[in-house]
């Protein structure tokens, strides 16, 4: 009897394709010391809304949530009386993206941390910018010098937002723009425009790949 080694060899040399873990379930907790980690004694928060951009669910008594399907992007709706902790780049830590160290082996999202903020202002002031449409690092420098720096230390806002077009078809500029806007010291949100899409995308679903990775969800809610 002759045994063929070809199938085994083909399996051995076949490339291994990494599959992004879905972010389908997780938890929201009260981060009383604001360190972004769930420490002993920090309770789960009930009644917090979480969304995948289509479905909205509410956390249970232990602060846990379960979405009905596998989600590539999950966001927590920051409620009034709380603030979101900051990500490493300074943006508010309100989203989880599958396959980017935001999920564990079981598919659970990294827990969302919300910090109590009982002295929230009665009236919200926000900085809203639109169509910065930077096309180069030089444009980013102009944006920082002429728009951001005059505001630094001189505004009374509690929230900031940039409306698209954030760049002029160059997603590589997102990190530099984030450095500029987060220097104003308020949570900063973004809304994409038609010039914020990946021009090499092969489908509509993939067209905001870079935006999602650097700036977060394109569908979300924020409460004050």
What are these regions (language model features)?
Residues 15-23:
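Beta-strand-rich domain onsets/edges
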Residues 24-30, 63, 112:
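A short, amphipathic beta-strand motif
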Residues 27-44, 117:
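Structural motif
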Residues 36-38, 44, 51-68:
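Short, acidic Ser/Thr/Gly-rich low-complexity loop/linker segments typical of extracellular
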Residues 7-15:
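Bacterial N-terminal signal peptides
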Residues 23, 95-174:
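N-terminal active-site segment of His-dependent metallophosphoesterases
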Residues 52, 73-101:
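A short, solvent-exposed loop/turn motif at the edges and junctions
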Residues 172-224:
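Extended active-site neighborhood of metal-dependent phosphoesterases/phosphodiesterases
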């Amino acid at each position: 009897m002759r045994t063929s080694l070809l199938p085994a060899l083909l399996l051995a040399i076949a490339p291994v394709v990494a599959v992004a873990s879905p972010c389908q379930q997780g938890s929201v907790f009260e981060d009383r010391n604001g360190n972004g980690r769930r420490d002993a004694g920090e309770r789960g928060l009930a009644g917090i809304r979480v969304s995948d951009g289509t479905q909205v669910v509410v956390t249970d008594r232990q602060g846990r949530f379960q979405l009905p399907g596998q989600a590539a992007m999950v966001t927590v709706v920051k409620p009034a009386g709380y603030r979101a902790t900051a990500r490493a780049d300074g943006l508010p830590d309100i989203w989880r993206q599958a396959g980017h160290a935001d999920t564990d082996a079981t598919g659970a999202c990294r827990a969302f941390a919300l910090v109590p903020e009982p002295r929230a202002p009665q009236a919200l002031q926000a900085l809203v910018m639109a169509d910065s449409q930077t096309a180069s690092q030089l444009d980013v420098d102009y944006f920082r010098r002429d728009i951001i720096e005059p505001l630094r230390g001189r505004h009374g806002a509690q929230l900031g937002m940039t409306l698209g077009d954030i760049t002029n078809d160059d997603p590589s500029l997102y990190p530099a723009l984030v450095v500029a806007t987060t220097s104003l010291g308020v949570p900063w949100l973004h809304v994409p425009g038609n010039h914020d899409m990946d021009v090499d995308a092969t489908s509509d679903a993939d067209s905001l790949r870079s935006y999602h990775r650097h700036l977060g969800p394109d569908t979300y809610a924020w409460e004050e």
